[in-house]
């Protein structure tokens, strides 16, 4: 490793630590570098507006880093980022895989990738579906507390999509408890008759579960137990996508 590379790595280490630690002593501990080195790097970062010294003396993100973050976020194409992980999951489970994004009280499909099965799911990219009738939606709801769930129900209602849709707050809460325990959610023909899914939530750089990943099949082809057997592959892909979107696995 060259001296230039070593210096670059030290600068990046200090910059990253300063994003999550305000106090100088905390930054030093996080990077495990000599105080003099950290002080010198911080001074350069402050001079270049990557770091700002707050009124209380703490280190906070400066205007340059905020500007770069905004530019980077504007250039993010989530569909492109997640597609390799979706393709890998499709190969593993040989089923249709969806990625959806939370939009108000609905899920919008961003990605749909089919397997080589002779049939196709009735879903389409850009379609909106209710949270309470979809595996992705219920997985996201399961990350909320009881008060937030009650506000959601009061606001959006629980309209019936099929004979199997959950239409009461009591039933929804009971299922969300199961989802929290298991780490994944089912759609038991609740959105489209004959279509079943297993899904889980995906966190992004905000730390919130704004996305979700699901595996879809026909009720005639896969039992609930067979879908549950895909949970490990599903959760691994979701963890990889979470990391790719800047979230913690």
What is each stretch, according to the model?
Residues 1-80, 87, 239, 243-247:
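N-terminal helix-turn-helix
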Residues 19, 137, 141, 145, ...:
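Short amphipathic alpha-helical signal-transduction/dimerization elements
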Residues 51-52, 99-100, 202:
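A structural signal for short hydrophobic beta-strand segments in well-ordered beta-sheet cores
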Residues 55, 103, 211:
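A cytosolic small-molecule/anion-sensing beta-strand core signal
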Residues 70-118, 143-147, 155, 172-178:
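All-alpha effector-binding/dimerization core of bacterial HTH-type transcriptional repressors
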Residues 119-191:
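Short, solvent-exposed recognition segments
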Residues 151, 156-157, 238-249:
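Cysteine/selenocysteine-centered motifs that mediate thiol-based redox chemistry or coordinate metal-sulfur cofactors
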Residues 168-238:
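Extended hydrophobic
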């Amino acid at each position: 490793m060259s001296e230039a590379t070593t210096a670059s790595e030290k600068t990046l280490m200090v910059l990253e630590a300063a994003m999550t630690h305000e106090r100088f002593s905390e930054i030093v501990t996080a990077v495990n570098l000599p105080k003099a080195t950290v002080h010198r790097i911080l001074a350069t970062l402050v001079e270049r507006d990557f770091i700002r010294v707050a009124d209380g003396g703490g280190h906070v993100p400066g205007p340059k880093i905020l500007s770069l973050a905004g530019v980077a976020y504007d250039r993010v194409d989530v569909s492109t980022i997640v597609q390799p992980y979706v393709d890998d999951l499709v190969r593993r489970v040989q089923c249709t895989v969806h990625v959806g994004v939370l939009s108000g009280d609905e899920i919008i499909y961003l990605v749909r990738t089919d397997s080589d099965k002779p049939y196709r799911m009735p879903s389409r990219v850009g379609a909106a579906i209710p949270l309470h009738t979809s595996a992705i939606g219920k997985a996201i709801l399961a990350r909320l507390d009881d008060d937030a769930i009650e506000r959601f129900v009061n606001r959006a209602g629980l309209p019936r999509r099929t004979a199997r849709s959950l239409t009461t707050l009591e039933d929804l809460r009971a299922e969300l408890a199961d989802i929290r325990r298991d780490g994944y959610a089912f759609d038991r023909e609740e959105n489209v008759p004959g279509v079943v899914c297993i899904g889980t939530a995906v966190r992004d750089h905000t730390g919130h579960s704004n996305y979700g990943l699901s595996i879809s099949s026909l009720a005639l082809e896969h039992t609930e137990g067979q879908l549950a057997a895909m949970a490990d592959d599903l959760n691994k892909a979701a963890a990889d996508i979470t990391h790719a979107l800047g979230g913690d696995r």
